């Protein structure tokens, strides 16, 4: 027993010595690299961390020549002493990898974002000709659970009011929806969604994470994202739905469109969406700065992945959404709802 304990002690000691030697070697190499760009070790490690996050997590990471990118970015950061001195280099990296959905924000910018009170337009709804229900959802930059619940209540109040007219034909207008909190939007629209699984996030390794709507709750996988404070509501009639999309339908607005994609009795009208059909995730750096990156693609319930934008079933050449009966996209939607 004594020799066994001694052997274990010797092995642990050797392991610790190896770790110390490796750490010392790594530190020496890091200092050499930092010196080669006339950077402080702190600034170099900070920039290295940001680049490593991009290389490992960015949704299009496998299409990028990272050695070339890093060479140019480190050159941009030459002379950096403080972590903040590397910010222009991080922005350059975002530009070089063509990252245009997320952002990089300094600690002071993050403080302003957290304090900013976002205002959002409530949904517009009304009954159109031929007993067609019209519901338009705008951008919803959620800031709290309280705001999410208020938004969900507004959307469901609109749906219940329209459904009281015994409608079975619906127009969901997403042409002015540039994103925000997809879960609040999907929760509000729950009565119009016909399946529990309404879409997926797709990781770079192919892993699928389902979007679920059930019993007035929306989930990402098995994790609850938002639960309604209202009782569940069921439509009086099986809905036939026209979804309107366009160039300003972006991010979470595209997620809502994807949730309806593949549902029976649904057709899309308008123009191609913005092309931000992916999920973003915030990565916080050591000084409090935030690197927001797109990390997962959207897929509809049938497994169709949207790598860029989403195309309508019927392209309508109209400039912008007008929310009026003279709107060619609304006219086309009404024609399909009532005649096909």
Describe the predicted segments one by one.
Residues 180-240, 278-282, 295-299, 305-306:
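Gly/Ser/Thr-rich loop/hinge elements
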Residues 46, 60-130:
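Extended, small/polar residue-biased N-terminal targeting/export presequences
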Residues 136-140, 173-177, 203-205, 244-248, ...:
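Active-site-proximal beta-strand/loop segments in catalytic clefts of secreted hydrolases
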Residues 18-36:
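Membrane-interface motif at the C-terminal end of an N-terminal transmembrane signal
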Residues 158, 162-179, 239, 243-244:
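Short acidic catalytic loops
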Residues 50, 93, 135, 172, ...:
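Terminal peptide-recognition signature
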Residues 1-23:
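N-terminal Sec-pathway targeting helices
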Residues 96-167, 218-223, 229, 309-325:
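C-terminal, low-ordered peptide segments at domain boundaries
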């Amino acid at each position: 027993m004594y020799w066994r304990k001694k052997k274990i002690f010797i092995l642990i000691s050797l392991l610790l010595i190896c770790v110390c030697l490796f750490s010392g070697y790594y530190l020496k190499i890091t200092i050499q690299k930092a010196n080669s760009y006339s950077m402080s070790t702190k600034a170099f490690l900070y920039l290295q961390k940001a680049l490593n996050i991009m290389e490992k997590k960015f949704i299009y990471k496998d299409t990028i020549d990272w050695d070339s990118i890093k060479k140019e970015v480190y050159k941009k950061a030459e002379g950096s002493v403080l972590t903040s001195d590397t910010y222009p280099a991080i922005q350059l990296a975002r530009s070089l990898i063509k990252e245009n959905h997320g952002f990089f924000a300094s600690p002071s910018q993050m403080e302003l974002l957290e304090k900013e009170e976002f205002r959002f337009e409530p949904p517009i709804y009304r009954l159109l000709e031929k007993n067609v229900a019209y519901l338009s959802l705008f951008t919803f930059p959620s800031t709290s659970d309280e705001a999410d619940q208020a938004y969900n209540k507004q959307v469901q109040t609109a749906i219940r009011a329209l459904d009281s007219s015994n409608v079975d034909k619906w127009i969901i207008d997403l042409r002015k929806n540039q994103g925000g909190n997809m879960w609040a939007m999907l929760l509000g629209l729950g009565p119009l969604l016909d399946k529990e699984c309404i879409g997926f996030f797709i990781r770079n390794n192919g892993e699928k994470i389902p979007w679920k709507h059930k019993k007035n709750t929306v989930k990402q996988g098995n994790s609850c994202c938002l639960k309604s404070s209202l009782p569940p509501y069921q439509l009086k009639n099986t809905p036939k739905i026209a979804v309107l999309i366009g160039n300003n339908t972006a991010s979470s607005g595209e997620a809502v469109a994807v949730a309806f994609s593949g549902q029976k009795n649904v057709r899309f009208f308008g123009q191609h969406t913005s092309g931000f059909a992916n999920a973003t995730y915030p990565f916080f750096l050591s000084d409090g700065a935030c690197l927001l990156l797109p990390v997962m693609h959207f897929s509809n319930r049938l497994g169709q992945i949207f790598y860029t934008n989403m195309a309508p079933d019927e392209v309508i050449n109209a400039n912008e959404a007008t929310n009026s009966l003279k709107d060619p996209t609304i006219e086309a939607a009404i024609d399909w709802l009532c005649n096909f």
